């Protein structure tokens, strides 16, 4: 686990890039700090499901809903939450699902046709049907009746814990143990570790405008192209001190600039944070940058490109992410391999001529030099750990974290 010195160093390094963290807890009006899920419809209103009820936030005021205020709510532990196109709110619990519409609660359980009371995820397809991922399978509600699917229909063991839809309106679902599931409305197709998926525990899925599937697993991020063939795996979006590299993904989302945001939590280290990908390189954020806590549970990007990160300690909102993320120099600059055993290569295809400083986690400059070619080698004889490259091209300064094994 990173120590305080690492936190302070990386705080000053990343904080200089300009993003803002705003944190919310019970002191601000949140019903409970242990936040499990989040949703928004684009109106600027956020809804959060917690261990002890529901919180609605309009940017100024908080409204809380619990079984004490609304007796129709089946449980205070909210396992899934979704605001629908028509404004209805659906929430999932371990005892069934609830719909809040026109100030009225309606509950659905197995007695009403639900396949399993233990809801994990709720979403809506373009035709207005409600899709409910459950511990034991899938239920689809057409407004009147439920259609249910489970292992006998082809869903692998592990149930459904995430659902997204592609450009062809096929559903892509994450299984708790069985991998990535494609459902065309008739049959299920399974993609698992035999197809290159990093791990068969799939926690989150997001599909981009090229119909690529970004699949968050318990071992990292797998990307399948529009032909559903594995394109790439990412296992170190959020850098950890050696020898730890595991990056379990808890949430995914794209903003309007096509920046990918990834929530990561490594439970055995009690460490976690948020990684951002600009299509070329990763930047990560953690508690040292202002994130409220390491136990990431969900991540939602709203229509204003605000990134809402839910944790067991409260909520962080990330805003004002600077345009450096799409800067040509940064995109063209490669530092590889990273991590390394001590030898790093720096390559830039667009220009040459840099002043580079290598700093340790305390901010001390270990060496400084000038690079005049497009490709250069750096030797780092120091001990294993996290270091920072400060790179200046004469007009701008950039930072890259490097890890020496």
Say what each PLM segment does.
Residues 4-14:
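Sec-dependent N-terminal signal peptides
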Residues 1-4, 404-405:
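Positively charged n-region of N-terminal signal peptides that target proteins for export
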Residues 14-15, 383:
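Generic detector of short, well-ordered, non-transmembrane alpha-helical segments enriched
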Residues 3, 16-327:
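Carboxylate-rich, polar loop motifs that coordinate divalent cations or form catalytic acidic clusters
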Residues 11, 316, 343-345:
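Local alpha-helix boundary/kink/capping signal
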Residues 328-336, 340-405:
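C-terminal outer-membrane/trafficking sorting elements
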């Amino acid at each position: 686990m990173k120590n305080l010195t690492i936190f302070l160093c990386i705080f000053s390094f990343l904080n200089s890039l300009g993003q803002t963290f705003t944190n919310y807890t019970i002191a601000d009006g949140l019903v409970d700090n242990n936040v499990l899920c989040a949703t928004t419809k684009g109106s600027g209103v956020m809804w959060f499901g917690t261990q002890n009820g529901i919180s609605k936030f309009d940017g100024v005021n908080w409204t809380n809903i619990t079984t004490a205020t609304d007796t129709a709510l089946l449980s205070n532990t909210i396992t899934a939450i979704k605001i629908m196109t028509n404004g209805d709110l659906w929430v999932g619990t371990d005892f069934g699902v609830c719909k809040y519409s026109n100030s009225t609660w309606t509950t659905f359980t197995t007695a009403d046709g639900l396949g399993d009371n233990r809801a994990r995820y709720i979403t809506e397809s373009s035709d207005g049907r409600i899709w409910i991922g459950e511990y034991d399978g899938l239920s689809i509600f057409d407004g009147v009746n439920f259609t249910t699917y489970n292992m006998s229909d082809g869903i692998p063991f592990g149930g459904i814990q995430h659902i997204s839809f592609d450009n062809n309106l096929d559903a892509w679902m994450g299984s708790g143990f069985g991998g990535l599931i494609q459902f065309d409305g008739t049959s299920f197709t399974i993609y698992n570790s035999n197809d290159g998926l990093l791990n068969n525990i799939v926690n989150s899925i997001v599909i981009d405008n090229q119909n690529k599937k970004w699949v968050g697993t318990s071992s990292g991020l797998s990307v399948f192209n529009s032909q559903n063939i594995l394109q790439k795996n990412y296992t170190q979006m959020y850098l950890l001190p050696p020898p730890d590299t595991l990056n379990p993904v808890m949430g995914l989302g794209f903003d309007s600039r096509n920046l990918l945001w990834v929530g990561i939590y490594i439970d055995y280290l009690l460490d976690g944070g948020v990684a951002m990908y600009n299509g070329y390189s990763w930047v990560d954020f953690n508690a040292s940058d202002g994130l409220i806590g390491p136990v990431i549970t969900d991540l939602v990007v709203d229509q204003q490109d605000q990134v809402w990160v839910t944790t067991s300690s409260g909520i962080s909102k990330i805003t004002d992410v600077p345009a450096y993320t799409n800067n040509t120099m940064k995109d063209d600059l490669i530092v590889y391999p990273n991590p390394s055993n001590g030898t790093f290569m720096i390559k830039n295809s667009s220009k040459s001529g840099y002043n580079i400083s290598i700093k340790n986690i305390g901010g001390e400059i270990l060496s400084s030099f000038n690079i005049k070619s497009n490709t250069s080698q750096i030797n780092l004889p120091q001990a294993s750990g996290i270091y920072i490259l400060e790179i200046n091209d004469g007009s701008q300064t950039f930072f890259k974290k490097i890890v020496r094994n």
